[in-house]
Amino acid sequence: MRNETLTLSSPAKLNLFLHITGRRPDGYHELQTLFQLLDYGDSLSFTPRDDQRITLEPSLPGVPEADNLIIKAARLLKEHITATSPDKAGQISGVSIYINKKLPMGGGIGGGSSNAATTLLALNRLWNADINTETLAALGLKLGADVPVFVRGATAFAEGVGDILHPVDTQEKWYLVVHPNLHISTAKIFSDKWLTRDTPKSTIAPALEGDLENLRNDCETVVCRMYPEIREAINWLDQFSPARLTGTGACIFASFSDKKRAEYVLSQMPTKYQGFVAKSINESPVLNELKQWRNH
């Protein structure tokens, strides 16, 4: 095992649309969505330790360590290796993890899920576990429905509970992502009795052709009813380009053909909001970073 620090990106995602097409007997929702990766996000650094401790700095406000997806991902991977490859268990060291956090929590842009995926990918490499992507994605699904798309590292059309992924190439666009400084509970939205749960299944074609007019986020109506501040933010952004919610929020977004226009709108954003401009990408930077690490 190389005793040096591995630093990897942890990109954001948008749900360009989100259709809820049914509900399974176990309570999980069937959905269709287009996960669009962005060239903006957190970064995580992993440094092997001489002991067996797994530590994270800085700790995230309001998130107990046991509930942090980064720590949970590290422990899950360690348990999996110990159970399935006892011969490799001796290679597992402790690890100090440092996060440079840019993405808001509870924003619907995949911050926690992306962090978990990056942790699985990083420690698989640091611990020389040689676990394939399929298995890592399955482990990721235990942590959250959005984790597998980040493990696979590609913009994708998703079905099932978000775990059946079809990689796609989307047209390059610039996005302005606005966070109205609210935290929205995904569980609260998905349990709301007024949530649309019977949207007819769509094909992948409209999403790829950019025909988002006929696609929507089924959570948006419920979220806007519960949180009028989200409707207010959407109305503001709508002045410049059609805006919509990503995931269950709280972030909203709009697309622009060029960076300059997106940055101009960002400069006009009310000070009560936070926001950033990012370019769409079809492949996660983590994949290339891991290749460079291997060749380093």
Curated annotation (Swiss-Prot):
Residues annotated as binding ATP are 104-114
Q: Which Gene3D superfamilies has this protein been placed in?
A: 3.30.230.10, GHMP kinase, C-terminal domain (3.30.70.890)
> Which Pfam families does this entry report, sorted A to Z?
GHMP_kinases_C, GHMP_kinases_N
Tell me one GO biological process term. Answer: terpenoid biosynthetic process
Instruction: Report the source organism.
Output: Hahella chejuensis (strain KCTC 2396)
Q: Does the keyword Nucleotidyltransferase apply?
A: no
Entry superkingdom:
Bacteria
Show the disulfide pairing: none
Family assignment from sequence similarity: Belongs to the GHMP kinase family. IspE subfamily.
User: Which keywords does this Swiss-Prot/TrEMBL entry list?
Assistant: ATP-binding, Isoprene biosynthesis, Kinase, Nucleotide-binding, Transferase
Q: Which Enzyme Commission numbers does its entry carry?
A: 2.7.1.148
Reaction catalyzed = 4-CDP-2-C-methyl-D-erythritol + ATP = 4-CDP-2-C-methyl-D-erythritol 2-phosphate + ADP + H(+)
- List GO molecular-function terms, semicolon-separated: 4-(cytidine 5'-diphospho)-2-C-methyl-D-erythritol kinase activity; ATP binding
Q: What is the role of this chain? A: Catalyzes the phosphorylation of the position 2 hydroxy group of 4-diphosphocytidyl-2C-methyl-D-erythritol.
Q: Which NCBIfam families match?
A: ispE
Q: What name is this protein filed under?
A: 4-diphosphocytidyl-2-C-methyl-D-erythritol kinase
Which pathway does the UniProt entry assign to this protein? Isoprenoid biosynthesis; isopentenyl diphosphate biosynthesis via DXP pathway; isopentenyl diphosphate from 1-deoxy-D-xylulose 5-phosphate: step 3/6
Residues at the active site = 13, 146
**Keyword Transferase in record:** yes
